């Protein structure tokens, strides 16, 4: 299930008007993260430019921020943009336990 939230941002020079959060994260991570925290993480992307990790055949640009900090807590955020859409999609998000972050 996906949930949509209105939110105005600029990411990679693109105007974003909404965030679509996939419920995938809830299967394993609902005790440490929720939609409100994810929206705060997404707000932290505002005004910045990122390089895509990959681009799908359907032209979805996949991004991974790891670590992405909210306060002093590290999170992993997997998100996507499409050149024809005005939304950012959140594929997955979770908090890194014990401060473990990938290098």
Listing of model-derived features with the role each one plays in the protein:
Residues 1-103:
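Ribonuclease/tRNase effector modules and their secretory precursors
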């Amino acid at each position: 299930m996906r949930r949509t939230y209105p939110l105005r941002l600029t990411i990679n020079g693109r105007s974003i008007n909404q965030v679509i959060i996939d419920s995938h994260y809830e299967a394993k991570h609902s005790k440490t993260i929720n939609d409100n925290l994810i929206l705060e993480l997404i707000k932290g992307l505002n005004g910045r430019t990122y390089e895509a990790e990959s681009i799908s055949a359907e032209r979805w640009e996949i991004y991974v921020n790891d670590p992405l900090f909210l306060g002093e807590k590290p999170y992993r955020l997997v998100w996507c943009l499409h050149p024809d859409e005005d939304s950012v999609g959140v594929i997955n998000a979770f908090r890194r336990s014990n401060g473990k972050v990938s290098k």
